[in-house]
Swiss-Prot record:
Binding site for ATP: 15-20, 57, 118-121, 178-179, 211-213
InterPro entries documented for this protein: DTB_synth_BioD (IPR004472), P-loop_NTPase (IPR027417)
Gene expressing this chain: bioD
Enzyme class: ligase
Single GO MF annotation: dethiobiotin synthase activity
Subcellular location(s) of the protein: Cytoplasm
Coiled coil: none
Metabolic or biological pathway, per its Swiss-Prot or TrEMBL entry: Cofactor biosynthesis; biotin biosynthesis; biotin from 7,8-diaminononanoate: step 1/2
Entry's family note: Belongs to the dethiobiotin synthetase family.
Protein name: ATP-dependent dethiobiotin synthetase BioD
A GO CC term assigned to this protein in UniProt: cytosol
Pfam families: AAA_26
Quaternary structure and partners: Homodimer.
HAMAP family: BioD
Highest classification ranks of the organism: Bacteria, Pseudomonadati, Pseudomonadota, Betaproteobacteria, Burkholderiales
């Protein structure tokens, strides 16, 4: 059995900075002295460069990790169109298979001390006719970090997602407040409300508040996260 740590990163929605926070976590783990690798099992939206199909989110994770995984291991399912994965997969003749992703994760654990698995979109994004990303998280059996995009509506989105994580029998290891809307009114009060509710109902700590950075710099955001607390939680989850 592998002693490597691993965490599943999900979000309250798409386009709320899940990849950015995952990259910040990778930088943080590396600074903590860990060999950190990233898995982006399903990526929708690809571009071609030098005859190779790539994905911007996967590129960002590669740049942050200090352990490089082969592209086919890091992203076993790379879809060309930037749309809902199960729809794109059907059009491209691809079957998004959870067992393949689990096997990729198992191999990644042999190459690093910690593996950050970034989901796609929110917590319940269909992968095929019968399975979604919540099923993937269950199959991997990992603690979950929830990235909350701090914008209007984030309180309900955060609480609903946390409930869904618990309903699947998974541990919410903590959450990150990512300030995606610099003009949002009462941002501090929104964060405080989510913090209090998730602590009371799920014992899930706030792992950090990531400021709205321009330009985006995950290496700077890493300093805004409590990586030591997250490492402790992941180690406890192994026992």
């Amino acid at each position: 059995m592998s002693t490597a740590l691993s965490v599943f990163v999900t979000g309250t929605d798409t386009e709320i900075g899940k990849t950015f926070v995952s990259a910040a976590m990778l930088h943080g783990f590396a600074r903590h002295g860990l060999r950190a690798a990233a898995l982006k099992p399903v990526a929708a939206g690809a571009y071609e460069r030098d005859g190779i199909w790539r994905n911007e989110d996967a590129d960002q994770l590669d740049a942050a990790a200090n352990v490089a995984l082969p592209p086919e291991l890091r992203t076993p399912f790379l879809l060309k169109a930037p749309a809902a994965p199960h729809i794109v997969a059907a059009h491209e003749g691809v079957t998004l298979d959870i067992d393949t992703i689990v096997a990729s994760h198992r191999e990644a654990l042999t190459r690093a001390n910690v593996v950050v698995v970034e989901g796609v979109g929110g917590f319940r994004v269909p992968l095929n006719d019968t399975q979604d990303t919540a099923d993937l998280a269950v199959a991997l059996g990992l603690p979950v970090v929830l990235v909350v995009g701090i914008r209007l509506g984030c309180i309900s989105h955060a609480l609903l997602t946390a409930d869904a994580i618990r309903q699947r029998g998974l541990t919410l290891a903590g959450w990150v407040a990512n300030h995606v809307d610099p003009a949002m009114s009462y941002a501090d009060e929104n964060v405080a409300t989510i913090r209090d509710w998730l602590a009371r109902e799920h014992r899930a700590p706030l792992l950090g508040r990531v400021a709205h950075l321009r330009p985006a710099a995950p290496e700077s955001a890493a300093a805004m996260l409590d990586i030591a607390a997250l490492v402790d939680t992941l180690r406890r989850a192994q026992h």
